[in-house]
Design a protein with these regions (language model features):
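A short, N-terminal "cap"/entry segment at the start of jelly-roll beta-barrel domains
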Residues: 1-61, 112-114, 176
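Glycine- and acidic-residue-biased ligand/ion/polar-headgroup-sensing regions
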Residues: 81-103
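Conserved short histidine dyad/triad with adjacent acidic residue
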Residues: 65-86, 124
Length: 176
């Protein structure tokens, strides 16, 4: 599905564009960038309480995260078997690749600050393999999920070359 045809993204884009939400997201992004700078990890994140959005989020949204991934990083394949993910590029750029029946499809994302939905957003249905390649600048994103933070599962292949083989699952919340 293209981001522009996802009705949930249309609502999220409007919510994120409000000045109060924008200020809160920028502050969270600043904290997560600092967290990444002081760690050795490939990425850092912070969970944004849904109360920060008031009552304007679609009912299906159960968690929101700010992620920052190191410059030049390649994340490898992962998927969330229990959540539909929608991500907005906040700073930097990169390529979100989604795995479909015909192989990997690239979705280049940039942080335009404009209303260009296809350039800034990606929609990832549950259990869809995805991987990221980050530009030479750290890439900050806002990700919305359809499960609560403590329920979000990251699944990775045991053998990166065999996406149909055995996988390893881990919950994001509580891990660092």
């Amino acid at each position: 599905m293209k981001a522009a045809s996802d009705p949930v993204i249309a609502v999220l884009n409007e919510v994120v564009g409000t000045s109060s939400v924008g200020a809160m997201v920028r502050e969270a992004l600043r904290r997560v960038l600092q967290q990444l700078e002081t760690s050795a990890g490939q990425m850092a994140w912070e969970i944004i309480p849904l109360t920060a959005f008031g009552s304007s989020l679609p009912e299906s949204i159960r968690s929101c995260w700010v992620f920052v991934i190191r410059a030049g990083a390649e994340t490898g394949a992962e998927r969330h078997p229990n959540s539909h993910q929608r991500s907005l590029s906040l700073t930097g750029s990169g390529i979100f690749e989604l795995r479909g029946p015909d192989g990997w499809t690239p979705h280049p994302l940039v942080s335009t600050g404009s209303d260009a939905t296809e350039q800034g957003w990606v929609t990832i249905p549950p259990a869809t393999w995805h991987r990221l390649s980050v530009s030479p600048q750290a890439w900050g994103m806002l990700s919305f999920h359809t499960v609560a933070p403590e329920e979000l599962i990251e699944e990775r292949p045991v053998d990166p070359n065999d996406l149909d083989g055995e996988t390893h699952q881990e919950r994001y919340a509580g891990r660092r």
